[in-house]
């Protein structure tokens, strides 16, 4: 059975700096119509850095959760940006580490409602060169 849905009408409900929210009318494989709400996002890149069996994590406040959470270093891609370049930039800005990066996976974190893809890299041959946080970015680094 063909599982593809055919887009009939597409409408952008909101367009912001980081995301846009869309509402599409689609034709389902059985010929019936349905609506799909989804978020468009440029994607992200993240880096897994392991030193002596400990993973480097960043801890920062995330407004959507209203609490501090641990994450691997990551950031959003600029439009048409090479994910490896974004990963290297984010690793150095957030943690102060520079490394050789090896792509290990690309994942679809929430495919039910966004087109975001996150590219994950493994840091090898890393060295500390100094943290350079973006304006308005506040975080702490921890090996756990």
Language-model features, listed with the residues they occupy:
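Beta-rich strand-turn-strand
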Residues: 81-86, 94-100
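Active-site-adjacent beta-strand/loop module that shapes the phosphate/pyrophosphate-binding cleft
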Residues: 23-29, 99, 111-130, 142
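Short, solvent-exposed loop/turn elements at beta->coil junctions and helix N-caps
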Residues: 10-12, 105-110
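A short coil-to-beta-strand element that immediately follows conserved catalytic motifs
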Residues: 6, 98-104
């Amino acid at each position: 059975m063909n599982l593809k849905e055919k887009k009939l009408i597409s409408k952008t409900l909101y367009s912001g700096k980081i995301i846009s929210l869309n509402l599409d009318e689609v034709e389902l494989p059985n010929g019936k119509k349905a609506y799909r709400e989804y978020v468009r996002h440029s994607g992200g890149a993240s880096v897994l850095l392991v030193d002596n069996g400990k993973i480097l994590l960043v801890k920062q406040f995330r407004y959507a959760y209203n609490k501090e959470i641990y994450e691997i270093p990551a950031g959003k891609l600029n439009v048409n940006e090479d994910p490896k370049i974004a990963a290297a930039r984010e690793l150095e800005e957030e943690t102060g580490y520079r490394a050789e990066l090896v792509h290990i996976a690309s994942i679809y974190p929430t495919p039910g409602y966004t087109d975001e893809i996150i590219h994950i890299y493994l840091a090898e041959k890393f060295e500390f060169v100094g943290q350079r946080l973006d304006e308005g970015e506040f975080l702490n680094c921890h090996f756990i």
